Curated annotation (Swiss-Prot):
InterPro entries in the cross-refs: Hemopexin-like_dom, Hemopexin-like_dom_sf, Hemopexin-like_repeat, Hemopexin_CS, M10A_MMP, MetalloPept_cat_dom_sf, Pept_M10_metallopeptidase, Pept_M10A
UniProt keyword annotation of Phosphoprotein present: yes
Domain of life: Eukaryota
Annotated PANTHER family: INTERSTITIAL COLLAGENASE, MATRIX METALLOPROTEINASE
Main subcellular location of this protein, as a coarse class: secreted
Organism expressing this protein natively: Bos taurus (Bovine)
Phosphothreonine found at: 274
Binding site for Ca(2+) 2: 158, 190, 192, 194
The name this protein goes by in its record: Interstitial collagenase
Subcellular location: Secreted, Extracellular space, Extracellular matrix
Domain notes: The conserved cysteine present in the cysteine-switch motif binds the catalytic zinc ion, thus inhibiting the enzyme. The dissociation of the cysteine from the zinc ion upon the activation-peptide release activates the enzyme.
Any GO MF annotation of the entry: peptidase activity
Length: 469
């Protein structure tokens, strides 16, 4: 999620562990945000009373630490800007630390052939679109388990699905647009397994507002007995993000199969895994600078570093650019145009800030003059001082003049001619401080383009402030 500016005036005083008196309308709103969030999702019980400065301070601090640990934030017990940012994101209404229990018994269905019924429909989508979204969401889970799901049109089903607003008499009222999007109950009789969607939201079948398929797939995980996951790449992560291709992560698959076992398919599906930024084996698909920051890309994720923040930000590419595909293969910044270009296959996209420019994607043949034998770009970097962009394809490099908008004569060359010592394959590259940083596998080479010498050999994730690397 794009970072907010640093909150210079924290809600916590230096020596205080409770809420201070709010000194502005914004602070008062933030105090209320923290209070409601901890009550709803971390079992903070204020009994409807105003949270006092000292009496409940220790409990509030502990609940905040619990929340920060769950989301992988700095564990301070203080509502800093990063913590408030997470609290303000739209999310599932099921608590993170306490089970959403209304029915006694085990958190699983004894019967593997389940029924569902859509009691009513949102006006935001056609009935056919709603039916398709719900069916696809159940199919994600049936693909990896012995479970089957059959739609019924009347009577009581195992999983009842409804679109409701506000207080809908289940002790878990919705809160209007944004915030709490939906919730579902663990398996069981009565309301057990049922899923409720807030009809004050705008439900869609694309990346805008809230994608029904994405939210339904998450809620049905609860209907089947899963709790929230701390893995940001998991479908069962509590905060909402539309990642383009909705899929179960390996964490989701492991969780649901621990309850019901694997599917009966001869070939078991394998889900994507979330990168561990301090994994010494970490490799990258693409890297680029963007407005002074460095962004690393892996599968459907980006990792973002900023000299003002010690932590690495990890999230879906779609958080910044929902129109870009996953699995980007190359990227580079044209700083004087405030533009970044992303490549996948023979297509590329130009972005400015968080906006994909109109008319993209385009193909690399007409725009850059590559021959049709080039099917994709491995890596790219633009040299700020000269306006020359280097493209790396297999063991060759091409040089493109950004001012003339044409390839330079004499190219392609073997990589070793212009960049001796870095090997015959480049996975990713970027320029910073006048140096090129080349990546291949787990290795990183700091290269001086003036002397054409390697200065330092590093591990690929050396930019991430890992204690052990």
């Amino acid at each position: 999620m794009p970072r907010l500016p640093l909150l210079l005036l924290l809600l916590w005083g230096t020596g205080s562990h409770g809420f201070p008196a709010a000194t502005s309308e914004t602070q008062e709103q933030d105090v209320e945000t923290v209070k409601k969030y901890l009550e709803n999702y971390y079992n903070l019980n204020s009994n409807g009373k105003k949270v006092e400065r000292q009496r409940n301070g220790g409990l509030i601090t502990e609940k905040l630490k619990q929340m920060q640990k769950f989301f992988g934030l700095r564990v301070t017990g203080k509502p800093d800007a990063e913590t408030l940012n997470v609290m303000k994101q739209p999310r599932c209404g099921v608590p993170d630390v306490a089970p959403f229990v209304l029915t006694p018994g085990k958190s699983c269905w004894e019967n593997t052939n389940l029924t569902y019924r859509i009691e009513n429909y949102t006006p935001d989508l056609s009935r056919a679109d709603v039916d398709q979204a719900i069916e696809k969401a159940f199919q994600l889970w049936s693909n990896v388990t012995p479970l089957t799901f059959t739609k019924v049109s009347e009577g009581q089903a195992d999983i009842m699905i409804s679109f409701v607003r506000g207080d809908h008499r289940d002790n878990s009222p919705f809160d209007g647009p944004g915030g709490n999007l939906a919730h579902a109950f663990q398996p069981g009789a009565g309301i057990g397994g049922d899923a409720h969607f807030d009809d004050d939201e705008w439900w869609t079948s694309n990346f805008q507002d809230y994608n029904l398929y994405r939210v339904a797939a998450h809620e049905f995980g609860h209907s089947l007995g899963l709790a929230h996951s701390t893995d940001i790449g998991a479908l069962m992560y509590p905060s909402y993000t539309f990642s383009g291709d909705v899929q179960l992560s390996q964490d989701d698959i492991d969780g649901i199969q621990a309850i019901y076992g694997p599917s009966q398919n001869p070939t078991q599906p394998v889900g994507p895994q979330t990168p561990e930024v301090c994994d010494s084996k970490l490799t990258f698909d693409a890297i680029t600078t963007i407005r002074g920051e460095v962004m690393f890309f892996k599968d459907r994720f980006y990792m973002r570093t900023n000299p003002l923040y010690p932590e690495v930000e990890l999230n879906f590419i779609s958080v910044f650019w929902p129109q870009l595909p996953n699995g980007l293969q190359a990227a580079y910044e044209v700083a004087d145009r405030d533009e970044v270009r992303f490549f996948k296959g023979n297509k590329y996209w130009a972005v400015k800030g968080q906006d994909v420019l109109r008319g993209y994607p385009r193909d690399i043949y007409r725009s850059f003059g590559f021959p049709r034998t080039v099917k994709s770009i491995d890596a790219a970097v633009s040299e700020e001082d000269t306006g020359k962009t280097y493209f790396f394809v297999a063991n060759k490099c091409w040089r493109y003049d950004e001012y003339k908008q044409s390839m330079d004569a004499g190219y392609p060359k073997m990589i070793a001619e212009d960049f001796p010592g870095i090997g015959n394959k480049v996975d990713a590259v970027f320029q910073k401080g006048g140096f090129f940083y080349f990546f291949h596998g787990r290795r990183q080479y700091k290269f001086d383009p003036q002397t054409k010498r390697i200065l330092t050999l590093l591990k690929a994730n050396s930019w991430f402030n890992c204690r052990k690397n």
